């Protein structure tokens, strides 16, 4: 829910009152003399001359009464050829870990906006499944999927990776492969999951290196179309893997790591034993222990 506050003259407030008279509501606020509710947006006019608009999209109504949204500033590099990389599945008990790196140029922006490309966290799975194939066909990218079986072979105590270093390895490899395919970016951005210092610490252990500098930026999938594209393709790859695993075991495997995952994991243990979790889940998650506790 958003809130917009406008300082208005008495004349402007009078116009607002007339326009919204049919939407007027009662108010018990001693400092307010008018209130209304229009299509989910609440409006309150105060004796101080301030008027608040509050709702899911308050800017729509507020714009009728003088509100002008500040133009969004394009992040540095948005108008450059950009490689963006993102991962999906690291927070889900079931399913693999998908990492995708994509190259987006300014010439791609109109196409991407026509599809409604945005941070995949704001898109439902149905929409992601719909537009991901179009992105895969149009946008140069490299996609990697670490299956649960392989994940459990390399991640854990005494193994080659921990839960963070394995993501560094996958991001590095996806970007490396994209560069090797001929991609020529002006900038490379990864949706930040680690500090740059620690990223470089793990990066030094990688076999495949490249000289191009990397920028780690928080919430990059909402700022850069290249990262948004990678996020969407990675989410689709993760979902397809989850579907495949679900078919193999005969249970619908949920995304996430909540109580539902504990319940399904316990059913898998009862039906198939420990090996079922080794091949469908990230075994080191706390869900494994919780699933065993459910069987006691």
Swiss-Prot record:
Membrane spanning stretches: none
Principal place of residence: cytoplasm
RNase H type-2 domain ranges (all copies): 80-296
Catalytic activity: Endonucleolytic cleavage to 5'-phosphomonoester
Keywords carried by this UniProt record: Cytoplasm, Endonuclease, Hydrolase, Magnesium, Metal-binding, Nuclease
CDD domains for the chain: RNase_HII_bacteria_HIII_like, RNAse_HIII_N
SUPFAM superfamilies, sorted: Ribonuclease H-like (SSF53098)
One GO cellular component, as annotated: cytoplasm
UniProt-annotated binding residues for a divalent metal cation: 86-87, 191
Subcellular location: Cytoplasm
Cofactor note: Manganese or magnesium. Binds 1 divalent metal ion per monomer in the absence of substrate. May bind a second metal ion after substrate binding.
Cofactor: Mn(2+); Mg(2+)
Annotated EC: 3.1.26.4
MF-aspect GO terms: magnesium ion binding; RNA binding; RNA-DNA hybrid ribonuclease activity
PROSITE patterns: RNASE_H_2 (PS51975)
GO biological process entries: DNA replication, removal of RNA primer; mismatch repair
Role played: Endonuclease that specifically degrades the RNA of RNA-DNA hybrids.
HAMAP family hit by this protein: RNase_HIII
Family, per entry: Belongs to the RNase HII family. RnhC subfamily.
PANTHER family listed in its UniProt record: RIBONUCLEASE, RIBONUCLEASE H2 SUBUNIT A
Protein name, as recorded: Ribonuclease HIII
Organism encoding this protein: Streptococcus thermophilus (strain ATCC BAA-250 / LMG 18311)
Source taxonomy: Bacteria, Bacillati, Bacillota, Bacilli, Lactobacillales
